[in-house]
Amino acid sequence: MVTAAAIKEFAHQLGFHRVGIVDLRTYTDDHPSGVAALQRWLAQGFQGEMAWMANPRRQKIQAVLPGAKSVISVALNYYQPDPQPPPKVKIARYAWGRDYHRVLGKRLQVLGQWLQSQVPEMDYRWYVDTGPVQDKVWAEQAGIGWIGKHSNVISRQYGSWILLGELITTLELTGDRPHTNHCGTCTRCLAACPTGAIVEPYVVDANRCIAYHTIESRAPELPAAIAAHLEGWVAGCDICQEVCPWNQRFAQPTDVEDFAARSPLLQTSLEELATLSDAAWDELTRGSALRRIKSAQWRRNAQAVLSSNPYD
């Protein structure tokens, strides 16, 4: 039988920076960020148009994989210092390089295949922000880090500049100790959010969030309350992470070459994005997580920045 230690060793060999395990046999959903918190968040309509967040399978891991016994949570540090020349537009740091779904997904696929070669009868599913799974909860419970007041997972080693994935398996594995919270009395992220999207510690209202509106919303126009406070952001927003003391102190450049600041979007001007054609969109977003933002939304976002709060 393959051990938890052997799994972690192999996962680290694949390049994952953090690996932890949750033993579902002993897991109890009584922590602040669990199912009850998700239900309260949904009841308040804080998911906006993200209907998939209400998928009932998200509230029970065994509905995702019948017979699930363990969750292997993994993380990759994606932090990159500001590139030179400086970007012409503000884009969330996670999207500066290649699509993280593919970068983590390839590694998780290999991990799953290796596990099955060790234990052929076991079953598994892996996800990278792609299924009805509470990624952050499992990362916290696996000891990867803790869910910060800005709702991102913070690790002692890398701050919150980490991308998460998980492999759910029917294997019975020894779990790790859940991570304790180290936000303390700090409220810098709440104070810094220009739209007040962090309505209380650990609770983000997507309806007020710049990242949500610039990436997920398909509305023809951004709400006035969002457009007036974009502060240059055309795709995502890192404000709450940039002010976090853990990030300011512990951020370190990633060794993952795929996360290097290579996206041509970084050197595309607001004026170009404001008139972006479908053909140019196809070229600029190829291989990027920001392909999720369609050409009409890029034009909408850039036009809103230009008309409200230009970023030079």
UniProtKB/Swiss-Prot annotation:
Pfam families: Fer4_16, QueG_DUF1730. It comes from the Bacteria. The active site is at 129 (proton donor). Keywords: 4Fe-4S, Cytoplasm, Iron, Iron-sulfur, Metal-binding, Oxidoreductase, Queuosine biosynthesis, tRNA processing. Its cofactor is cob(II)alamin; [4Fe-4S] cluster. [4Fe-4S] cluster 1 binds at residues 183, 186, 189, 244. InterPro entries: 4Fe4S_Fe-S-bd (IPR017896), 4Fe4S_Fe_S_CS (IPR017900), QueG (IPR004453), QueG_DUF1730 (IPR013542). It catalyses: epoxyqueuosine(34) in tRNA + AH2 = queuosine(34) in tRNA + A + H2O. Pathway: tRNA modification; tRNA-queuosine biosynthesis. GO terms for molecular function: 4 iron, 4 sulfur cluster binding; epoxyqueuosine reductase activity; metal ion binding. It is an enzyme of class 1 (oxidoreductase). Its EC number is 1.17.99.6. Belongs to the QueG family. Monomer. This is Epoxyqueuosine reductase. It comes from Thermosynechococcus vestitus (strain NIES-2133 / IAM M-273 / BP-1). The gene is queG.
